[in-house]
Every structure is written in C-alpha cells, then in structure tokens.
C-alpha cells in the first residue's frame, strides 16, 4: 500500500524519527524536500531522506491521448524544449539524503549540492 511505503522503508533501514508519506499530486517530491529542510532547520532531526516515486503496477493500461488534456499527442515528453506539447507518465524515483551543511562538513560527507 502506497500510504505505508515510507514507514516500511524506514523500518527496513532501521531509521528513527518521523516517516511521512506526502501526496500533493505533482508537487509531492518538492514538498517532501521542503518539509525535510524545515525539520533540519528546526533541529527536529540531523539527517533526512526525501524524494518521490511514481510506479504504475501492474502495467495494465496503454497510452490514451485526449485532446485538451495534459498528455502529449505523440507520447513523448520534451521538458524545457520549444516543441514541448504535453507530458507522459512513466515509472521512476528520486531520493536525496539531506544534512545541515556544517554537520556534513564536520563529518567529511560528500556534498553534491547545497539548498538555500
């Protein structure tokens, strides 16, 4: 069940603290990162894992274009392209591990990016 995915992952990885499943349609991943950053800023936690996942299971349906909807007429997604004409749903995930910069520097963690 999608509502328990974050809790099951936290349990399997022996993580402590809140495990939240956030559902805000297209903004879920960004809201998860925002909430993780707020928890870090407030001192509620010293590390957070945030991200998003989109999986359609089982794959039983095909692609159906309907004029006036958000899906691309040719089934191709062209983000940031002048020829962009809609989106296409697919499976994927993205996860980030977040820490306060000063803590990551002290511990010698590899830093890929800094959120401000």
Task: Give residue ranges: language-model regions.
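Condensing-enzyme catalytic core of the thiolase-fold
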Residues: 1-116
